[in-house]
């Protein structure tokens, strides 16, 4: 169900523009973060739990959370600011971007990111909507362009159809190499040891749903 826009959204975002990416040309990430640390991108960052946990854990990495809903962007940013405050840390390595994945190439240069995360993306179950799925070949080509060579993309889902679709799309390209692939993340100790759960993931795991995960390397 689509979340209705909250009345406070615009005011909150306008008060916190420092943490929002605005652009009229392609973005230089070194200028955005005022450093040259590697940058990771979460596409569809939801309410920010995953992004915030990683940013707190890895202060020498930069993180961008991309979300198409302005209200969810605001909720995520609010959560990030609160968690950093609770940990007595200044939030310097997270920025939020309220845009669609279709806009990636007009926003970012080639080789901008070291890692991309796709967590529990909309499966778009109707066959006619297959090009909207974030692991459709057209999107995979975009990710390959904005990732550095040998950079990684991590994909998690509870949806078996989207998981199988993703594997089929990967067969259509030679730009990627599958590094890890599991049908049950919580019974894969190697992948689980560094796993950071999302809000949805925790909910699905508690409901005894399998979590699928694929990690792929960008071969360019």
Curated annotation (Swiss-Prot):
Pfam families: Methyltransf_4 (PF02390). InterPro entries: SAM-dependent_MTases_sf, tRNA_(Gua-N-7)_MeTrfase_Trmb, tRNA_methyltr_TrmB_bact. It catalyses: guanosine(46) in tRNA + S-adenosyl-L-methionine = N(7)-methylguanosine(46) in tRNA + S-adenosyl-L-homocysteine. The active site is at 122. Keywords: Methyltransferase, S-adenosyl-L-methionine, Transferase, tRNA processing. Transmembrane segments: none annotated. This is tRNA (guanine-N(7)-)-methyltransferase. The gene is trmB.
């Amino acid at each position: 169900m689509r979340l209705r826009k909250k009345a406070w959204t615009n005011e909150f975002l306008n008060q916190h523009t420092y943490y929002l990416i605005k652009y009229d040309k392609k973005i230089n990430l070194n200028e955005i973060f005022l450093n040259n640390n590697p940058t990771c991108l979460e596409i569809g960052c939801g309410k920010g739990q995953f992004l915030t946990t990683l940013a707190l854990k890895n202060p020498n990495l930069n993180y961008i959370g991309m979300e198409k809903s302005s209200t969810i962007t605001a909720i995520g940013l609010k959560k990030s600011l609160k968690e950093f405050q609770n940990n007595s840390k200044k939030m310097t390595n997270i920025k939020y971007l309220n845009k669609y994945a279709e806009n990636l190439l007009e926003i970012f240069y080639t080789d901008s990111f070291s890692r991309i995360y796709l967590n529990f993306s909309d499966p778009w179950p109707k066959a006619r909507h297959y090009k909207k799925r974030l692991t459709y070949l057209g999107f995979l080509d975009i990710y390959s362009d904005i990732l550095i060579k040998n950079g990684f993309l991590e994909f998690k889902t509870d949806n078996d159809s989207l998981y199988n679709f993703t594997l089929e799309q990967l067969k259509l390209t030679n730009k990627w190499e599958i590094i890890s692939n599991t049908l049950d993340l919580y019974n894969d100790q190697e992948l689980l040891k560094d796993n950071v759960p999302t809000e949805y993931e925790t909910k699905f795991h508690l409901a005894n749903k399998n979590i699928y995960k694929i990690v792929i390397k960008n071969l360019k």
